[in-house]
Amino acid sequence: MARGTIASHISQFPIGTYKKAHAHGPGAHVIILSGEGYSLMWPEGEEPQRFAWQVGTLVVPPNMWFHQHFNSGPAPARYLAFKHWSPRNAQGVPISWISRRLGGTQIDYADEHPKVRSLFAEALAKHALTPRMDDVYAAEIPNLPPRAA
């Protein structure tokens, strides 16, 4: 970690919502600050595995595993994510922010695993909640890059 830095961000997401799946290198740590839910994590080509979380849980996605965070509880969820970052090696936008359709490692909602939405609806139903993602799905469509041929 010589001349390295730790980069961090806090993210909060409302009840009934979830983040896009993405993959990146090793070392990211996600500490759950509020809420309850779960994360799906999986290596390329395999089925997603579900990991429940609550306040105080530490989520550490393995190197280049896809992962996705879901707020299935009755309150907003918040997490603190941090990882090593070296400014001298930074070049442009992180690959985990770029759609797989453009060569990145972020999975657009339109391209997510078929089980994602049904698992989420089932988890929310345990709290008598429903997904609040329809506007998010619709907002993504006009900006989606075309699928590779």
List each model region and its residues.
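Short acidic-glycine-tyrosine-enriched beta hairpin
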Residues: P43-N63
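Intrinsic, low-complexity N-terminal interaction/targeting segments
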Residues: M1, T5-H9, S39-M41, E46, ...
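Short histidine-centered beta-strand/loop micro-motifs
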Residues: Y18-H24, R50-A52, F70-N71
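Conserved hydrophobic/aromatic beta-strand scaffold that supports enzyme active sites
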Residues: S8-Q12, H29, R50, L58-V60
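Glycine- and acidic-residue-biased ligand/ion/polar-headgroup-sensing regions
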Residues: P14-I15, H24-E44
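A short glycine-rich, His/Asp/Glu-containing loop-to-beta-strand
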Residues: M1-K20, G27
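Double-stranded beta-helix
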Residues: F70-A149
